[in-house]
Amino acid sequence: GAAEGVPSPFCDCPMCNYAREHGGKDVRKRSCFRLGRNIMIDMGPDIFTQALQYGSMCDIEHVLITHTHDDHFNFTALGLMSMATHLRTTPVHFYFSEEGYRFIELLRDSEIAFGGTLRGMEKKGIYAFHKLKYFETYSIGEYEVTPIRGNHGGNMAKERSANYVLKAKDGTKMLYGMDTGLYEEETLDFMKNQNLDIWM
């Protein structure tokens, strides 16, 4: 896929035309990966269509954001969640790298984000935003989650994508490694001792 999806709305190259004609697996939406009942990785701009295709997102409690490019974190989708808050008793938790979290700090009082009401939505318990440090392990939902430093930028200066090592209760360990180039030495050193069962 690509940041604009496949087929790109404004492209008539052979690949995009093939995807339009054949559909199915050749049509690619923007990033969003559901892990079990209540964890999701990224929340791109196709979340509405993905929910239509794959079912309700009501059980989502935790969203791990890889980076703040809008094909991975489309903050306007937060508005969809806020429209159903009467059905929720707990906030949806969003997790960012330290650099990516700065994007939330900018949005909190920005008129571009729901007329400057994001901070108020936090106070009402609709959302909770968290910073994660690379290479530290956190208990999130039913997984042990370790963000590792990817090699891909984001909207903020010096932001690098967070790829995620996730360990399930049964010991299965996976790497969600989207939007990265070749890993830097620090990440490679960390990964040497990871015995992965699944690499995405």
Which functions belong to the PLM regions below?
Residues A3, H69-F73, F103, L182-E185:
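Active-site environment of divalent metal-dependent phosphoester hydrolases
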Residues F10-C13, Y54-M57, A77-M81, R108-E111, ...:
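Short, glycine/charged-enriched secondary-structure capping and boundary segments
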Residues G181-M200:
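Cap/insert and terminal regions of metallo-dependent hydrolase folds
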Residues G1-Y54, F129-E186:
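Core dinuclear metal-dependent hydrolase active-site scaffold
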